Amino acid sequence: VADREDVDGIVITHGTDTMEETAYFLDLTVHTIKPVVLTGSMRPATAISADGPLNLLEAVQAASWPDLGKYGVVIVMNSTVHSARFVEKTDTTHADTFKGRQMGCLGYMQDGRPRLYQQPLRKHTWSSDLAAPKELPAVAIVYAYVGLTADDVRRLAQGKAGLVITGLGHGKMPELVWQALQPLMEQGLVVVRAARALGGMVTQVPAYDGTVTADSLTPQKAKILLQLALAHTTDREKIQAIFDAY
């Protein structure tokens, strides 16, 4: 659709539960300068003050603004414009559920057009070198917690090309889990360390040499980027370079 000459912008209606994941996948794989906007609703059409109609109207208005494509794929909800990379669903029921907790929003919808105040610097859409393969490599997310065992992780790693560890603090994990992962990594398993904390980033530390770090990506977005990276290469250093660029 993005390649059609009669299409100036794209609006996708989507359920809110996984909207941020679809938005980020498209942000990495749709190579276009045209606006791509996702939107949805938190309240049903039968509810008093349903949010769907206004969200859809403002999504279309946003997609009609040609310069929006420079910002990558966005989510427009509750009169707010969010970058696909940073947006998260933060509340189970509230209409203002989508937040850019790390870096804030890109801007707001006002008077029928987006008014934007910052621009993503990481690679996306028209600057992305990643492409969607016919089949994505298998990657699982492991949530670290008190009591997580090595056997739990070994089971989850079976048949997987990569694991994303939703780590404690700065991407840490129980020592026995780390010991169990090292031989799997030697066999080719790629391990990405993300954080279960709501802010901050995960960076390299000597204690977890050989892992890839997710920087400020949420675990679910780190999984998407790892799948696309593994479709291109299995070299850990090259995968880290991809995470540093996107």
Regions found by a protein language model. Name each.
Residues 4-19, 159-170:
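Short acidic, glycine-rich surface-loop motifs adjacent to enzyme active sites
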Residues 5-9, 31-36, 68-72, 77-78, ...:
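Short coil/turn connectors at secondary-structure junctions
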Residues 12-34, 173-182:
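Short Gly/Thr/Asp-enriched flexible loops that form oxyanion-binding sites at enzyme active sites
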Residues 15-16, 41-44, 168-170, 195-200:
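Short, ordered loop/turn segments at secondary-structure junctions
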Residues 38-110:
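Internal gly/pro-rich beta-alpha loop/helix module
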Residues 83-170:
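Accessory alpha-helical/coil subdomains and C-terminal extensions
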Residues 170-246:
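C-terminal non-catalytic interaction/assembly regions of soluble proteins
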